[in-house]
C-alpha cells in the first residue's frame, strides 16, 4: 500500500499552523468596539450571517472577513458608526494579514523527514485568498518543503 502513495497533500490554516484563534481574537475586539450597538452575541450572529451572505461573492479569508465586518458594523449601527471606528475595523482586518505564523508542534520536522525521503510529492491544498495564503506560507518558512501549492476559493468533494 505504501508504494501506491505518491502525493501527500496538507491543508494550511489550522493544520500546519494556528489560524482560527487569531480570527476569534479579532472578532472579540470587533464586538467590544460595537458594544454601543448590541450584545457581543448579537453582533457575532449578525457578522456570521453577513459572512454567509457574502461567501459566494467574496470567498474566504481576512479580506472577505474585513469587508463583512464593515458591512455588519454599518448595519447594526443603523449607518451611524463613525469613520474612526470604521478605520479601526479596517486595521483589525489588516492585522489578520500580518498575523504571526505559529506552526503546530512537529510540523516542520515531519515535512523535513518526508522531503528528505524523496518518495513523495508534497502539496499544500488550501482555500482562501491567494495572496494571503502565499504570504502566510512564506512567513511560515515551510514553502521550500512543497512541490506544489494549490489555493482554491473553496474545497468541495468535486475539487
Regions found by a protein language model. Give the residues of each.
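A conserved mid-domain beta-alpha-beta active-site/ligand-binding segment of alpha/beta enzyme cores
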Residues: 159
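Active-site neighborhood of HAD-like aspartate-dependent phosphohydrolases
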Residues: 1-46
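Conserved H-loop
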Residues: 143
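A metal-dependent, Asp-based hydrolase signature
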Residues: 36, 48-95
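Substrate-recognition element of Asp-dependent hydrolases with the DxDx(T/V) motif
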Residues: 84-92, 96-103, 107-140, 149-155
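An amphipathic alpha-helix signature
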Residues: 23-31, 66, 70, 130
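Short, well-ordered alpha-helix to beta-strand connector turns
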Residues: 5, 146-147
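Receiver (REC) domain switch/active-site residues of two-component response regulators
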Residues: 13, 147-148
Amino acid at each position: 500500500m505504501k508504494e501506491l502513495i505518491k502525493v501527500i497533500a496538507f491543508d494550511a490554516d489550522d493544520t500546519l499552523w494556528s489560524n482560527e484563534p487569531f480570527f476569534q481574537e479579532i472578532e472579540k475586539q470587533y464586538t467590544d468596539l460595537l458594544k454601543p450597538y448590541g450584545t457581543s452575541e448579537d453582533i457575532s450572529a449578525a457578522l456570521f450571517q453577513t459572512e454567509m451572505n457574502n461567501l459566494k461573492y467574496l470567498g474566504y479569508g481576512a479580506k472577505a472577513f474585513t469587508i463583512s465586518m464593515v458591512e455588519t458594523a454599518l448595519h447594526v449601527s443603523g449607518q451611524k458608526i463613525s469613520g474612526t471606528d470604521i478605520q479601526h475595523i479596517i486595521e483589525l482586518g489588516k492585522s489578520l494579514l500580518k498575523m504571526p505564523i505559529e506552526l503546530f508542534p512537529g510540523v516542520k520536522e515531519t515535512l523535513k523527514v518526508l522531503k528528505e525521503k524523496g518518495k513523495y510529492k508534497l502539496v499544500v491544498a488550501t482555500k482562501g485568498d491567494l495572496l494571503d495564503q502565499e504570504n502566510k506560507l512564506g512567513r511560515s518558512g515551510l514553502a521550500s518543503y512543497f512541490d506544489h501549492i494549490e489555493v482554491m476559493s473553496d474545497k468541495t468533494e468535486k475539487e
